[in-house]
C-alpha cells in the first residue's frame, strides 16, 4: 500500500496529489504543461504538470531520470530550493519562489501547506505496488469505430 510522504503510515485518503508544488512570489509568462523547468542556481530540473495562475502555484514532477529530475552536468538529483529563479524551457516563463510558509485553500476547501514556498507530494514516491500491467501493441482505429472498454478493480 502507498504511504504518506516521509512516513511509513499507509495512506487512507480517497484522492492524493503526487506532484511537488512551488508558490510564486512573482512570475511572468505562462508555464506550459509538460515543459521542462530548470533552476539554474541549484541545477534542479523538472517537468510542469499544471500552472495555477490564479493562486500562483506551479505543480511539477521531478523523477530520477537523465535531464528530467537530475542535473544534466553532474547527473545528481537536485531539488528545487530557495527563492532562486525557475524558468520554463519552451515558454520562457519565469517564477521567483515565495519564502513564506503558509496554508493555501484550494478548490473544494482542500488545503495545501507550503514550507518556505514549497510543498512535497502527498504520497511517498516508490511506495506501494503495481498490481497489474499489460503492454499491448497499438491498434489502428477508424474514425467511425466504437469501442467497449471494461475495467475490473478488486479491493
Feature names for model-found ranges:
Residues 1-155:
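Interface-prone segments of viral and bacterial extracellular assemblies
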Amino acid at each position: 500500500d502507498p504511504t504518506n510522504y516521509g512516513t511509513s503510515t499507509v495512506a487512507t485518503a480517497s484522492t492524493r496529489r503526487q506532484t511537488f508544488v512551488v508558490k510564486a512570489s512573482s512570475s511572468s509568462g505562462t508555464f506550459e504543461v509538460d515543459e521542462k523547468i530548470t533552476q539554474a542556481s541549484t541545477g534542479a530540473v523538472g517537468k510542469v504538470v499544471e500552472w495555477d495562475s490564479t493562486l500562483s502555484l506551479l505543480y511539477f514532477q521531478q523523477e530520477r531520470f537523465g535531464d528530467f529530475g537530475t542535473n544534466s552536468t553532474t547527473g545528481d538529483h537536485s531539488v528545487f530550493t530557495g527563492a532562486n529563479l525557475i524558468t520554463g524551457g519552451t515558454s520562457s516563463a519565469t517564477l521567483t519562489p515565495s519564502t513564506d510558509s503558509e496554508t493555501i485553500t484550494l478548490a473544494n476547501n482542500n488545503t495545501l501547506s507550503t514550507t518556505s514556498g514549497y510543498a512535497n507530494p502527498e504520497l511517498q514516491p516508490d511506495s506501494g505496488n503495481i498490481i497489474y500491467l499489460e503492454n499491448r501493441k497499438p491498434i489502428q482505429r477508424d474514425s467511425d469505430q466504437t469501442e467497449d472498454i471494461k475495467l475490473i478493480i478488486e479491493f
